[in-house]
């Protein structure tokens, strides 16, 4: 299904230099003028809460509620964000983070995480770590118990073992079935799936079975391993088909501000599904998937990590806030850097999914995305959201965006 994507203009006059240079055609200029009034309204009334408060990605509603609970109980902001994301890391139903995360191309779950503590200005991170359900805690251990910032691969695994983290299998049935579905439908010429050299069946019933199997649109490995009643099997296989076609670019970022105006943040992920083993995205890279400046604010990201790395995304957002931008405008300006890399060409940008989240010292906060909606593997549009607890209640809010995607 072809999606009709119309331009929703950049929500701002204060574009960064690279973006301004790209906005030279009459179409770009006209659209910018149309949106300037809307941007002015948004800038005059930024979302604001009263600490303790927390901001997270859309899968972090439970995380922001937990973070505020921890801070109200006297916990530090780093305690708060780690406790918040642990809920999602341990949730097998979230296949973009921790336990149950979608694996790499070999079927191994590799996790990345970073943590930053505003009051001490320290950071810690791990990448490509296996066998630990809560990599955010290992990132914290790097922060607190070493003079390093980032430990990767087998070294990260050994460091985790030394600090008492049990080595566990992170694949759930669901993530394994999704990987099998992707693996067996990846190529018609590899060795996965039914053999084309099956001997001739000895009976008419056998011939009919072979003919039926070869007529199927896909192979049957996933079906063979899916457990449960018929309804559950159908739901699981439908989900596996969707994920195999369009893997989610999940992750969770969580930021927290306490009554003393101290800030901390964490980002944790299982990374890009079916990735080449050892691939590292933005989440564990300080300044990319997470950045905290206790004098200004904090930012984090989810989505396509390579795009965020190119622009040092989280650091860019915080720098825009340091220069006076609201959290929303700062997020949008960072997203404009990504759009500018592609000449603001919507056709090239249509499959790029990036979200930023920001929180400043005054309690102003925001979430913003390149596109107003994401497109699921079933072709359905889903409005971009983020989670926030403003000191009163936790809820999901609609994200600001650069471009509007319409059905």
Regions found by a protein language model. Give the residues of each.
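Intrinsic low-complexity/disordered segments
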Residues: 2, 35-36, 42
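Glycine-rich phosphate/cofactor-binding loops in nucleotide/flavin-utilizing enzymes
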Residues: 376-392
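N-terminal secretory signal peptides and thylakoid transit peptides that target proteins
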Residues: 1-18
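Signal peptide processing junction and immediate N-terminal pro/mature segment
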Residues: 26-38
């Amino acid at each position: 299904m072809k999606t009709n994507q119309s331009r929703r203009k950049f929500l701002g006059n204060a574009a960064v230099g690279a973006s301004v240079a790209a906005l030279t055609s009459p179409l770009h200029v006209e659209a910018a003028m149309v949106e300037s009034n809307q941007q002015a309204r948004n800038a005059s009334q930024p979302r604001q809460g009263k600490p303790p408060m927390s901001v997270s990605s859309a899968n972090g509603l439970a995380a922001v509620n937990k973070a505020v609970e921890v801070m109200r109980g006297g916990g530090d902001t780093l305690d708060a964000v780690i406790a918040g994301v642990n809920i999602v890391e341990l949730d097998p139903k979230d296949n973009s983070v921790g336990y149950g995360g979608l694996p790499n191309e070999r079927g191994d779950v590799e996790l990345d995480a970073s943590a930053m503590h505003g009051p001490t200005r320290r950071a810690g991170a791990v990448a490509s770590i296996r066998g630990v359900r809560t990599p955010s805690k290992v990132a914290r251990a790097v922060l607190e118990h070493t003079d390093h910032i980032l430990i990767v691969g087998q070294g990260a695994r050994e460091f985790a073992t030394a600090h008492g983290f049990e080595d566990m299998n992170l694949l759930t049935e669901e993530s394994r079935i999704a990987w099998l579905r992707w693996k067996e439908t990846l190529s018609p010429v590899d060795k996965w799936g039914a053999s084309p050299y099956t001997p001739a069946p000895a009976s008419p019933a056998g011939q009919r079975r072979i003919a039926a199997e070869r007529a199927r649109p896909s192979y049957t490995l996933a079906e063979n391993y899916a457990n449960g009643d018929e309804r559950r099997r159908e739901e699981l296989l439908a989900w596996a088909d969707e994920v195999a076609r369009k893997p989610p670019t999940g992750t969770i970022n969580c930021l927290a501000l306490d009554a003393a105006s101290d800030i901390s943040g964490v980002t944790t992920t299982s990374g890009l599904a079916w990735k080449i083993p050892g691939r590292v995205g933005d989440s564990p890279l300080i300044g990319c998937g997470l950045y905290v400046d206790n004098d200004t604010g904090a930012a984090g990201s989810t989505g396509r990590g390579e795009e965020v790395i190119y622009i040092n995304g989280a650091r860019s957002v915080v720098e825009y806030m340091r220069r006076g931008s609201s959290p929303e405008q700062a997020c949008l300006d960072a997203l404009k850097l990504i759009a500018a890399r592609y000449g603001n060409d919507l056709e090239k940008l249509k499959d790029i999914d990036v979200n930023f989240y920001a929180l400043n010292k005054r309690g102003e906060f925001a979430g913003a995305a390149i596109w107003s909606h994401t497109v699921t593997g079933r072709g359905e549009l889903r409005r971009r959201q983020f989670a926030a607890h403003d000191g009163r209640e936790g809820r999901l809010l609609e994200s600001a965006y650069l471009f509007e995607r319409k059905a």
